[in-house]
């Protein structure tokens, strides 16, 4: 009797195990069927069940892939990237059949919406053999390997990785751009210019690459500036469109180029633009120093003093607020990020005098990247409220939501740290400039003008080129228009100002 | 509303000169001294234009937005006579201009139009039996010289800039007047065998002198809208306005051959530069 009952119990157990296994198998099949019927929300939920509960590894892997695919079909690319990333991080092993496909999918997602550099760098910590990287994902893979090496200052390794980015890949232009930067850092200026020119050719008339195109123009200008081809540098700065965020930087940097070819009236004209009320919250403190030394070169000593005074008047109140702000957020990167975020949304209440630095910080790449991540994650979190509402039990919703929240939090933390560091840099720059103004004033008071002018002496740069306003070289076939500046700023005139102020140096020599 | 202040780089208008002819003569002489600013000039070296701004500490120097020099301008416009009391005159106008440089141009205009009687004319006749003498302008053909002393810009409240120029014009031509004698002549009495028949309605041309001024508003680098007001003086033969010219001549009455009649026109149009 006891035997019979033992047998019955064993039978029942076996039967239940069989049933349960059939049930799981049936779940995966059901998930696949739902996916085939394009019922992606239900398919995602079913795949997640299998992914979580199935004891079978093969089935689990398939469910993981199916889950990621379903989420992507639901336009939840960030959420899908979580599961693709799990697959990729596992590496190329026999029981990970979707490795190559997942890598390819991540590359596609990242070319549409940035996954964030830290996410991708983490992804490629796993050692991957070249043969294991599928063709379409090579651009994605090598580009970020290059970026990682570049960040570590391993320029040659980075260059090799960028070189491996195949032509035609959406990452190729970015790779060429980085190679240009590397070439310049290695002192190969002609190669750097050639690479940036390639980027320019590749981005022409493609609005999605506008930022890359402008940065290439800026970099060609900077390389030319570095090798003292100032006129060429100015012509590249002059190609930055007026409506670009980089335009004022181009005006500012070209002021130095004008200074070195002794076009002081153009230098002062550009600074006049920078100091216009249109840009009163833009952070260019060095403009006062350049203005002062330009006047110094023109032996206009009263105006040197005036420039120094204006620097002091403008930036002395800023110091206190910047110092207070940096002290307040020391060790609190998330708080610092939020502070800048609040500034962007127009709700800043403290450290108002530091506004131009805060504005500048809100435009650095780290902050903009984090803002993109926040925007994309928030968009998905909102979408999940409706798309994920049908998911029973809430485990999938919780898993995806946790991932998105954590991604956002990491992005904020990382950006907060990087932006704070940048802010410290600006503060140090202000201090340094303040010391420079004191030096100039002190030297002037001591009458050591010759020493001071010698310090800022200009080399044998090509001074033949003639420039009108707007960073444009004089063209003999052009008819010009002149507008006097009479204290009223017109928006269309910004960038076109040219001073009409002779140097007093010869007069002084003559009078001696 | 934001103040719309023009800025003018080439203001040579002298308010002390009341005569347009004198102004044009002055402008012509002046233009011999100040040519359009050619880029060959070094902005850092003295030139006519630099001289004009020699006391300006900060100036904008840039390629001119709209160049007219050595360009043809063809346009179409609607012209209306403003000072005829009893008729409306609207004329379709064709404009052809060649710009010698930024300041000087030669312009030909041809207008042809229709005349519509005003209500006043009908009321005068119906209620008071008064017939009115009317100069019905049928066409105007003029060749003029044009001088542009002002090139400027306006900023609209939206921030958009509109460049414009202001010109003065003077020229010679011919005005065609349509004489409709039943407008103002009494029909001859059928019972009077000596009555002279009314002259046949006809269009007669008279020499015309014209002065005026206008503005072009440049909407882009090839197109502009035009607005102008012109004063035309034509010299007509008095006998052409006579209801019984044969009888009048027979009585030895003297008729002036150059009696002036003035017409003021306003023009709105669009033109394209080639």
PLM feature segments, named:
Chain A
Residues 40, 77, 116-117, 155, ...:
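TPR-repeat structural position
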Residues 25-49, 138-152:
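Alpha-helical segment of the N-proximal tetratricopeptide repeat
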